[in-house]
Amino acid sequence: MDYEIRQEQKRKIAGFHMVGPWEHTVKQGFEQLMTWVDRQRIVPVEWIAVYYDNPDVVPAEKLRCDTVVSVAENFILPDNSEGVIVTAIEGGEYATAVARVEDRDFAKPWERFFDVLEQDSAYQIASAPCFETYLNNGMEDGYWDIEMYIPVQRK
């Protein structure tokens, strides 16, 4: 898997914080997010899932994620936005890779990316959330093209 190290800017995000098994909460969170975006006529810059925990360490029922859209820096949360959070993904150095997700198996490209990145001689994984952006509408296309972001720091 090819990847590159990039400096990313801080992203302001709005959406839903979810807790539980990612195979359920991410789908549920994006359903809620789509409803809110449509109802509020939000024009998202990006659709993003943010992952806070290591599923090899944290029990599935305690896994945390955010299903969000990136918004302009001057974004103000509209009325009738119950349950919506506004927060940020911090800027910094990230390893990034693009992958295609088929059969809804989002774990496979992430596992491959982590395995490859752990072999990097110059960078190590930093203690911060990972995230993915969606490059297409997988509900329409039957597959998802995603860009994965893992925070890194020099060894």
From Swiss-Prot:
Localisation: Cytoplasm
SMART domains referenced in this protein's UniProt entry, alphabetically: AraC_E_bind (SM00871)
SUPFAM superfamilies recorded: Probable bacterial effector-binding domain
Gene Ontology CC: one annotated term: cytoplasm
Keyword field contains Secreted: no
Molecular function GO terms recorded: DNA topoisomerase type II (double strand cut, ATP-hydrolyzing) inhibitor activity
Principal location class: cytoplasm
Gene3D superfamilies xref list: Regulatory factor, effector binding domain
Key words, A-Z: Cytoplasm, Stress response
One Pfam family it belongs to: GyrI-like
The protein's assembly and partners: Interacts with DNA gyrase.
Function: Inhibits the supercoiling activity of DNA gyrase. Acts by inhibiting DNA gyrase at an early step, prior to (or at the step of) binding of DNA by the gyrase. It protects cells against toxins that target DNA gyrase, by inhibiting activity of these toxins and reducing the formation of lethal double-strand breaks in the cell.
The family this protein is said to belong to: Belongs to the DNA gyrase inhibitor family.
Name of the protein described by the UniProt record: DNA gyrase inhibitor
Protein species of origin: Salmonella typhimurium (strain LT2 / SGSC1412 / ATCC 700720)
